[in-house]
From Swiss-Prot:
Lineage top rank: taxon: Bacteria
Family indicated by similarity: Belongs to the universal ribosomal protein uL15 family.
PANTHER family for the chain: 50S RIBOSOMAL PROTEIN L15 (PTHR12934), LARGE RIBOSOMAL SUBUNIT PROTEIN UL15M (PTHR12934:SF11)
Role noted for this protein: Binds to the 23S rRNA.
One GO term (biological process): translation
InterPro entries: Ribosomal_uL15, Ribosomal_uL15/eL18, Ribosomal_uL15/eL18_sf, Ribosomal_uL15_bac-type, Ribosomal_uL15_CS
Alphabetized GO MF terms: rRNA binding; structural constituent of ribosome
Keywords recorded for this protein, A-Z: Ribonucleoprotein, Ribosomal protein, RNA-binding, rRNA-binding
GO terms for cellular component: cytosolic large ribosomal subunit
Name of this chain's protein: Large ribosomal subunit protein uL15
Organism, as annotated: Pelagibacter ubique (strain HTCC1062)
Subunit structure: Part of the 50S ribosomal subunit.
Amino acid sequence: MTTLNTTGKVLYKKKMRVGRGIGSGKGKTSGRGVKGQKSRSGVAIKAFEGGQMPLYRRLPKRGFNAIKRYQAVIAIMNLEKIQTFITEKTINSGDVINMALLKKLKLINKNSQKLKILGTGEIKDKVNIEADLISKSAVEKLEKAGGTIQLKK
């Protein structure tokens, strides 16, 4: 027979009910202190791990942050693309191919600040190109096709 004095140890502690008056010991602020972010409900402090050193501070720094806002946005155009535009009659072979023309025809991004011509593919038509940057292979292929190149400074 089990009686109150022979029940044995309690296996778990009873859960404290908070906010049930000051006499309970956990009334009014319910053990949260006074005001501030930690006293409100539903608010967790981001990356806070209870005082333990957070993961982002335990790991070493890696790499660097490139300041991209100071770098020019370069539009890249290959010779094969230019040849395709000429064959499709998007660009006339007599036109001067420059950034203004390519932006007008929406062939490059409107935010581009410089135009670079690369030598991928072949070009058959004579073309006049005005660009900021150009690769050696592109220069060779354009001269071979009889085209002209004008570099902007």
